[in-house]
Amino acid sequence: MKKEIASHLLEIGAVFLQPNDPFTWSSGMKSPIYCDNRLTLSYPKVRQAIAAGLEELIKEHFPTVEIIAGTATAGIAHAAWVSDRMDLPMCYVRSKAKGHGKGNQIEGKAEKGQKVVVVEDLISTGGSAITCVEALREAGCEVLGIVSIFTYELEAGKEKLEAANVASYSLSDYSALTEVAAEKGMIGQAETKKLQEWRKNPANEAWITA
């Protein structure tokens, strides 16, 4: 499953690998990878494979789920497709409460005591997913865990999720993606080394000249 999804993401250009010409994230950090899972919305077969995979993860790890919650905005569509497949209620969670109207942070009906699984498109440092989890917990929901399309497998993300006491499972990850990219001839040994070094310590830009 991990390599299949990784292959899909590479084929449609949802993931870009540029170890020799790094991207600069909004945080200022240099990165050899950029992920835009919103592109999956435009490819029916890919988004169907993702929805089926997320459903499988949820049934395996969180079988008692009662409602699906999407993170705004990238997780909303995938949460909708998964909830439809599973015939479950759905809501979505904003990064912060609206400044007008009812001031809702959670849109849709999430009731106190309901068992929720959060659907996220990408796990990097885990910040947006944890914000979603905290909002649901404050509303009295029981958050069973998070499922996502892809994770960078960053230690900072793992540590934050552990500190928040929330389980997280992804359809694909950085390791599988770099392996598939190498198998497809998209990157060579030198590029693979740079990608591996970045993964070990993203904050240290020594990987750029590795």
Swiss-Prot record:
Signal peptide: none annotated. GO terms for biological process: 'de novo' UMP biosynthetic process; pyrimidine nucleobase biosynthetic process; UMP biosynthetic process. GO terms for molecular function: magnesium ion binding; orotate phosphoribosyltransferase activity. Its cofactor is Mg(2+). Pathway: Pyrimidine metabolism; UMP biosynthesis via de novo pathway; UMP from orotate: step 1/2. 5-phospho-alpha-D-ribose 1-diphosphate binds at R94, K98, H100, E120, D121, L122, I123, S124, T125, G126, G127, S128. It is an enzyme of class 2 (transferase). Keywords: Glycosyltransferase, Magnesium, Pyrimidine biosynthesis, Transferase. SUPFAM superfamilies: PRTase-like. InterPro entries: OPRT (IPR023031), Or_phspho_trans_dom (IPR004467), PRibTrfase_dom (IPR000836), PRTase-like (IPR029057). It catalyses: orotidine 5'-phosphate + diphosphate = orotate + 5-phospho-alpha-D-ribose 1-diphosphate. Its EC number is 2.4.2.10. The keyword Magnesium applies. This is Orotate phosphoribosyltransferase.
